[in-house]
């Protein structure tokens, strides 16, 4: 959750974590299938703009997310169900070179969710503020999906 430097792609980084009692097979579709995000998150709309191949939500898919009229687009760049999802933001954030990876790890009591990303700010001097915003947002996503998955696992 600290800045790594001042230049080049990925100069600012973050990492958040959450745990759920649900197995990875329950958590994976909630994160991997774009349309399911609005079930468990604060997003008002979620879905695919373009399907990936061979899996519609996999590599090459462009996902669109909206929260109260503000949207973002991201491309899936890594796909290893039910353990790893990587994506790059195409639009919607004031950043360049944004890359994030969500990793699901089986643990004795369920699943550990790790969300890590890196970016460069488009506007000089805004990196630390964006980093703080992204840490809070991604922690909320991780906590919300963990809590929702806990309920599905009951």
Regions found by a protein language model. Give the residues of each.
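Hydrophobic ligand-binding cavity/cleft-lining segments
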Residues: 1-51
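Short, P/G- and charge-enriched loop/turn segments at secondary-structure junctions
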Residues: 2-5, 59-63, 89-90
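Short, ordered beta-strand-loop transition motifs
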Residues: 7-8, 51-59, 78-80, 105-108
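A structural signal for short, well-ordered beta-strand segments
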Residues: 14-20, 102, 115-117
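Short beta-edge strand/loop motif at the mouth of beta-sheet-based domains
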Residues: 15, 35-71, 82-84
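Hydrophobic-ligand binding "helix-grip"
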Residues: 38-39, 66-112, 118-120, 148-151
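A conserved amphipathic terminal alpha-helix motif
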Residues: 112, 118-154
């Amino acid at each position: 959750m600290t800045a790594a430097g001042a230049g080049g792609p990925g100069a600012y980084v973050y990492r958040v974590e959450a745990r759920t009692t649900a197995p990875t097979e329950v958590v994976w579709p909630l994160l991997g299938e774009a349309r399911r995000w609005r079930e468990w998150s604060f997003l008002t709309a979620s879905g695919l703009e373009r399907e990936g191949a061979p899996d519609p939500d996999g590599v090459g898919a462009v996902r669109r997310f909206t929260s109260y009229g503000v949207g973002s687009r991201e491309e899936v760049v890594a796909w290893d169900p039910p353990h790893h999802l990587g994506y790059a933001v195409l639009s919607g954030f004031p950043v360049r070179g944004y890359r994030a990876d969500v990793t699901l790890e089986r643990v004795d009591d369920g699943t550990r969710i790790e969300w890590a990303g890196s970016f460069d700010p488009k506007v000089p001097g805004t990196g630390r503020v964006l980093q703080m915003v992204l840490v809070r947002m991604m922690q909320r996503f991780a906590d919300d999906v963990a809590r929702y998955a806990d309920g599905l696992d009951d």
